[in-house]
Amino acid sequence: MAGVKERAVLVLEDGTVYHGYAFGARGKTVGEVVFNTAQTGYQEIMTDPSYHGQIVVMTYPHQGNYGVNVYDMQSNRPWVRGFVAKEFSRVASNPRAQQTIGEFMEFYGVVGIEGIDTRALVRKIREGGVLKGTIAHASLFGAPDHAFTQEELEALRREAQAWTDIDGRDMTPEVSTPLPYAWPTLKSGRRIVVMDFGIKHAIVENLAALGFEVIVVPGKTPAHQIMALEPHGLLISNGPGDPTMPRYAHETIWKLMGLLPTFGICLGHQLLALAAGGRTFKMKFGHRGANHPVKNLQTGKIEITSQNHGYAVDIDSLKDFRPTHVNLNDGTLEGMAHARYPVFSVQYHPEAAPGPHDALYLFRRFLEEVEAFHGATGLPVEKQRADQHGI
């Protein structure tokens, strides 16, 4: 029927139902329901591999008004399981736009829902923690104006409940590059190997902008293969899922500890802590947004940061690391540095994309660590350390 908005529902695993209207690709999807407080940056959010397995609810009510373009992609496709907003724009008011958000979601098969009470949904997640949920469009049941029955809603609830949890699941093989590759750059300076657990383009772009030669390798790459590339530094990337599950990464990172200047971001921060004998825990609803205040314990300055994580490092479990940054909202650990080695990490995203650039200095700090390390030691010492580590 022309002009009729297609009905849709979001059904949570506890039976809560939110009625709204279909948007994006038509169909059904299941995932972990989380929220993001950023006002803009929906394209970067959808294409961030760290959101793999999740249905993202945007707290800012209006999304899509500036459209979508190829330049803001953070990977080669969207990774969200579903996308939720109070209202999506049908037009793209931006000269950079190449598609509307609706066209983008339809092209890539992203199922969405709009018109629900997103404030009530976010309050529920904040108070009770993240839940699994199912988005379903009415056309699956026969007609765009189909009224969902209690039996249909119960079936959708059971589907959400049965969906495989992110907890206890290694998601690296689903998002990591299958083969090593070199990132295009105009310069050829110190060589950095990036362990890819679901990296965003903006991270690699920041490394290349500093003159690094960047080689991206699969997250499962063992230590001896990384060292065979003769890197001057190591970056451990962001990514989705439970940090305790890629145990092969813990072993690799432990073997490389102290051999190379190392920078961990988000999941990479958690993997570093676990490799060093620390602990992580799942947060109630996580940190996802572009406005999280973090205190730099070394300078006393406050940084407004972009964040996207559902797990955190237990600050009391650190052994060879010292805290360098803490979250001002809940006191959780946001950064750490090794007591002896040029190894440091942050839980947030210094590259932003989307978000503020308060933490871009961390990439230059990494460059300085690399230059200082190789100026003071050189390859023979690295070879000796590698032999000691059995690499």
From Swiss-Prot:
> Which superkingdom, per the lineage?
Bacteria
Please name the GO terms that the record assigns under molecular function. Answer: ATP binding; carbamoyl-phosphate synthase (glutamine-hydrolyzing) activity; glutaminase activity
Q: Does the entry feature the keyword ATP-binding, yes or no?
A: yes
What are the BP-aspect GO terms? 'de novo' pyrimidine nucleobase biosynthetic process; 'de novo' UMP biosynthetic process; glutamine metabolic process; L-arginine biosynthetic process
Q: What is its EC number?
A: 6.3.5.5
Q: What class of enzyme is it?
A: ligase
Sequence positions that bind L-glutamine: 50, 239, 241, 267, 270, 308, 310-311
Q: Does the keyword Ribonucleoprotein apply?
A: no
Q: Which reaction does it catalyse?
A: hydrogencarbonate + L-glutamine + 2 ATP + H2O = carbamoyl phosphate + L-glutamate + 2 ADP + phosphate + 2 H(+)
- Pathway in which this enzyme or protein is active: Amino-acid biosynthesis; L-arginine biosynthesis; carbamoyl phosphate from bicarbonate: step 1/1; Pyrimidine metabolism; UMP biosynthesis via de novo pathway; (S)-dihydroorotate from bicarbonate: step 1/3
Region described as CPSase: spans on this chain: 1-187
- SUPFAM superfamilies listed in its UniProt record: Carbamoyl phosphate synthetase, small subunit N-terminal domain (SSF52021), Class I glutamine amidotransferase-like (SSF52317)
The active-site annotation reads: 266, 349, 351
List, alphabetically, the SMART domains matched: CPSase_sm_chain
Where the record annotates domain Glutamine amidotransferase type-1, the positions are 191-376
**What keywords sit in the KW lines?**
Amino-acid biosynthesis, Arginine biosynthesis, ATP-binding, Glutamine amidotransferase, Ligase, Nucleotide-binding, Pyrimidine biosynthesis
Q: Which family does it belong to?
A: Belongs to the CarA family.
Q: Which HAMAP family match?
A: CPSase_S_chain (MF_01209)
The protein's assembly and partners: Composed of two chains; the small (or glutamine) chain promotes the hydrolysis of glutamine to ammonia, which is used by the large (or ammonia) chain to synthesize carbamoyl phosphate. Tetramer of heterodimers (alpha,beta)4.
> What is the protein's known function?
Small subunit of the glutamine-dependent carbamoyl phosphate synthetase (CPSase). CPSase catalyzes the formation of carbamoyl phosphate from the ammonia moiety of glutamine, carbonate, and phosphate donated by ATP, constituting the first step of 2 biosynthetic pathways, one leading to arginine and/or urea and the other to pyrimidine nucleotides. The small subunit (glutamine amidotransferase) binds and cleaves glutamine to supply the large subunit with the substrate ammonia.
Q: What is this protein called?
A: Carbamoyl phosphate synthase small chain
Q: Which organism is it from?
A: Thermus thermophilus (strain ATCC 27634 / DSM 579 / HB8)
Q: What would be the name of the gene that encodes this protein?
A: carA
